[in-house]
Each structure stands twice: as C-alpha cells, then as structure tokens.
C-alpha cells in the first residue's frame, strides 16, 4: 500500500484491509483513508468511460428519516419537491441554510411517505445529522445516522449492468434511472441497488451491511474481469464527475455558494411551499446573480487547479473551483465561479498559473455528454 504515512487516526471503510492486494495508493479524504488510485487515474477513468469501474464509496453517509411527519419534515428541510417522488424513486436535492448556502447536496431514497434514506457526503455526515436534529422541531420524526453500519460500492460504465447481472437473478434492466430496489440478492447478499452514480455513465450504487463488502467487491471484480472492469479510486471519480459537469461539495458547492450560483436552480422548487433558505434564494433570483459557475477551456498550455485566480480586464473576477487535463477530451479544462458580467460563453478570461496570466475561453460546463440509461 502506497501513499499517506499517518493512516492510524483516519476512519477506514470495510474494504481497507484488502487495499494492499490491489496496490491502492491511499490518501486522507475528509478524515477517511481512501484509495485515490489503484493502477492509475487515467486508466481507471478510461475503464469507466469504455467498460466499467468499481468504486469503494463506503465513506458516504446514510441517514434514515422515518415517522408520521417524515414527508413534511423533509419537504421543509430540502430544496427539491418530494411530493413528485414515487416509492422506490431517488431524488437529488440540496439542504440549505437560512442564507441559501448549501449545507450539503444529497440523494433521497423514498421507501414510503414515512420512510426515507438520505445519502450524504462523507465530510458532512455529523454536520448534516446535527442540522436535521436541530430542525426537527415539532415534526414527529425519528432521525437515525446509520453510516457506520452500511458499506457502499458503485459499479459505473457502459458494461456495468451486464457485469452485475451475472451475480443476480433480479432483472436489473427493470431498475430505471434514479430508481432503486431493496433486498436484491447480489452474489447471495441482500443489497439495496439503485441506478445512480457520479460519473456521467450508466451504473449502479449498491448498499449492504459492512460485513459483506469485501465478498461483494471481490465477486464483482471477478464477474467483470473479461469485460475490462477495473477497481477505481477517488482520483478517477473526481475527473469523471468533473467532465460530466457534476458538482463536488467544497468546490462547486458550499455554505457560501448557493445552488443558483452553481447553475443548479433546477433542483430548487420555489413553487412547492416553504423550505429553509427559500426567502434568501428567492431574493437572489429576483435581484440577479452576482456570481456564476462557468466552464472554461485553456487556450494555451497550463492546467488550471482548484483555487487559482481568474482575471479579466486586469482584475480578479473569481477563482477556479475544479480544473484538470481531461482524459476523455484531451484538453485542459476547468470550472470557475466568476463575476456574472463575464460569464457569457465565448468570453476570454485569464487564469493565473504559476504567477502568469494564461488565456482561456468560457464554454458550456457540461463538457461531456452523459450516457445515462433512461
């Protein structure tokens, strides 16, 4: 095992013990010892785009909300509209503070009007859980943080369904995009399986008790060995989500960045009644956005990185939220949060790389066309 020296104080997923077998390079991610890569970020990225990759995402948090008032409680807590959700459907949404900033972005799994599973970002588990408890008020709900009991694997890529199908009698083609099925037997283990992911490709996220994670990881890799399936780390997960224009909390979203500034207003439903942050977001919408998230492509050499300054007219207009050499597009591209008046597609900006202003042009931030099965 290569990478971080002081792993002792970090949290570990149930798969940590077998990382050395796969030559994982370990980093500290939000207090977790996680594989940034196995073979290489680029080869893992390409495997997901062309065949499939298997990710350990057991660091993600799971919080159950149940009880008579589960629906009205979540409808008030979250920006998206849960009234449109069918049983066994998944919803992407934000949990905002009273200023409209994002406490977290998350997935809601609806079992029924009085039972939901929320899947939250690893760095925000405790913060989210406290925020939910603090806002429970008069609602008759039970809120349980079950993150420590549940492991999660994600198989992503055009061959994901074909590979996973080898391990189950369940017809996976019947699980539609952003739907899930519980108690699906994968290699004999009862799992929750959803057609969701964070790569821009088709695929599944699989939730199971911790004690079955190692077995399932190895069984899935074995089933996919003739299909080009590779174990994939957080490095490829980040380049994949970035190409697909999907936000990362702490980069494109945060308590100081609203969903509207991030260009994700679609997931904020102003017509659904009251919710925390609504007034601030409505005011921002009516007054017009001062900042916008944009995509850009470097004209010259130079790879933009998170935090780099962006300039126009010889003044600072914002900063890079994420930047990479795109393995799929073979270009240096980035996302930046900048002054709205410079945010038109086609505008030239400059990114300060090693103290030099390098030219870039604003482009559509969905760099890669998503290949979801709908």
Swiss-Prot record:
Any single GO CC term annotated in Swiss-Prot or TrEMBL for this entry: glycine cleavage complex
Cytoplasm is among the record's keywords: no
Single Gene Ontology BP annotation: glycine decarboxylation via glycine cleavage system
Alphabetical UniProt keywords: Aminotransferase, Transferase
UniProt EC number: 2.1.2.10
Enzyme class: transferase
Any one Gene Ontology molecular-function term assigned to this protein's record: aminomethyltransferase activity
Catalytic activity: N(6)-[(R)-S(8)-aminomethyldihydrolipoyl]-L-lysyl-[protein] + (6S)-5,6,7,8-tetrahydrofolate = N(6)-[(R)-dihydrolipoyl]-L-lysyl-[protein] + (6R)-5,10-methylene-5,6,7,8-tetrahydrofolate + NH4(+)
InterPro entries: GCS_T, GCS_T_bac, GCST_C, GCV_T_N, GcvT/YgfZ/DmdA, GcvT/YgfZ_C, TrmE/GcvT_dom1
One family name in Pfam for this protein: GCV_T
Self-association and partners: The glycine cleavage system is composed of four proteins: P, T, L and H.
Family label: Belongs to the GcvT family.
Entry-linked NCBIfam families: gcvT, PRK00389.1
Function comment: The glycine cleavage system catalyzes the degradation of glycine.
Protein name: Aminomethyltransferase
Native source organism of the sequence: Caldanaerobacter subterraneus subsp. tengcongensis (strain DSM 15242 / JCM 11007 / NBRC 100824 / MB4)
Protein's gene: gcvT
